[in-house]
């Protein structure tokens, strides 16, 4: 493969059977036939080919095509999900806001309030929202996604002992610009998932996330902060180049989003 993946996402075969080839093309020799419901882990991919991935099956390595011949129907299901991205809106004055979400590498699953070709809300400076569809009140817009196929960048980040997770998140989220309330809601959601692990390899994603989960907001915000954490649990610590994080300055109409995903490995 052009790029080897150390912490690749898990997937299961959903086609009746899936051929594994010795190269990323059907002209190569078939190395194995993988039955339906088999659990696999992505080990690598080609930079210029989104249809083939490199996997291991029963000690053999090879390539599988993750789409049928129509290039739309998938042969596998990815188990990684985008968990609880929430969107806060802070206009300078009462404002009608339209928010659209475009997912190119995952499938929209649950939304609240209900997403109907976007969200239409009246937003207030304190962050409170009124959903125009039914008049319900909210603190944020919630969404999550399944079958996430995004290849997140795990080359830089932080290896953190599970027992140090709370301290780490408080420090980094404050530095990146979350308010105490936003930070507390982030930590309350993620801490129970992470602190019992021996270690966590933690990254905060940039373009890999923002380009695959695009936000279109009308009116356009003056400042936008999108924090998306991706982590994987480890039994032992690893050395990794520390990630340089950016700070965030709030000005004018401000939008803040946070969420995350765990790369689970069998």
Each predicted region: which residue ranges?
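Intrinsically disordered, low-complexity Ser/Thr-rich linker and spacer segments
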Residues: 2-9, 68-78
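Residue-level detector of short, conserved catalytic/binding motifs and their immediate flanks
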Residues: 18, 38, 53, 85-87, ...
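SH3/SH3-like beta-barrel superfamily modules
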Residues: 1, 32-69
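Short alpha-helix capping/helix-loop boundary micro-motifs
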Residues: 24-29
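Short, surface-exposed loop/turn motifs at beta-strand boundaries within globular domains
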Residues: 11-13, 33, 48, 80-84, ...
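Core beta-strand residues in small-molecule sensory/regulatory alpha/beta domains
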Residues: 19-23
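Protease-labile, long low-complexity intrinsically disordered regions enriched in Pro/Ser/Thr
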Residues: 77-266
């Amino acid at each position: 493969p052009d790029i080897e993946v150390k912490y690749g996402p898990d997937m299961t075969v959903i086609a009746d059977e899936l051929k594994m080839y010795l190269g990323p093309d059907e002209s190569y020799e078939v190395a194995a036939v993988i039955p339906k419901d088999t659990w696999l882990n992505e080990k690598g991919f080609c930079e210029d080919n989104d249809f083939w991935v490199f996997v291991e099956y029963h000690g053999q390595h090879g390539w599988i095509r993750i789409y049928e011949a129509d290039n739309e129907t998938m042969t596998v299901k990815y188990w990684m999900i985008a968990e609880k991205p929430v969107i806060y809106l802070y206009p300078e004055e009462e404002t009608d806001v339209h928010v659209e979400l475009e997912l190119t590498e995952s499938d929209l699953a649950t939304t609240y309030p209900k997403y109907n070709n976007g969200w239409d809300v009246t937003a207030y400076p304190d962050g409170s929202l009124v959903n125009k569809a039914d008049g319900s009140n909210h603190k944020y817009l919630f969404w999550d996604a399944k079958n996430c196929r995004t290849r997140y960048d795990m080359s830089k980040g932080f290896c953190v002992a599970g027992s140090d997770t709370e301290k780490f998140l408080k420090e980094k989220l404050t530095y990146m610009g979350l308010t105490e309330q936003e930070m507390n809601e982030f930590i309350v959601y993620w801490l129970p998932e992470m602190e019992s692990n021996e270690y966590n390899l933690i990254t905060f994603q940039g373009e890999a996330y923002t380009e695959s989960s695009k936000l279109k907001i009308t009116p356009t915000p003056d400042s936008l902060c999108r924090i998306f954490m991706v982590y994987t649990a480890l039994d032992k610590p690893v050395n990794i180049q520390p990630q340089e994080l950016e700070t965030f300055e709030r000005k004018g109409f401000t939008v803040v989003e946070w969420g995350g995903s765990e790369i689970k490995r069998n």
